[in-house]
Amino acid sequence: MNISITTEFIKLDQLLKYSGVAESGSFAKELIWEGFVSYNDEVCTMRGKKVYPGDKVRVHIPGEIDEEICVE
């Protein structure tokens, strides 16, 4: 999915909520801390990671969620 932002960046946990992949901030935080989120093809466990236009975020939980978010 493509997500457009109007700011310079968006924090990783906020992106997961904004995109609808995570229903709440606590679920977004859990996904990140458990290692289910990758940032530009590398696992990222920093919920405050700044995501800029052109970056790709993937959430992958085998058998449950497999979503790639492209920030524009």
Language-model segments: residues:
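Residue-level detector of beta-strand structural context in well-folded domains
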Residues: 1, 35, 55-57
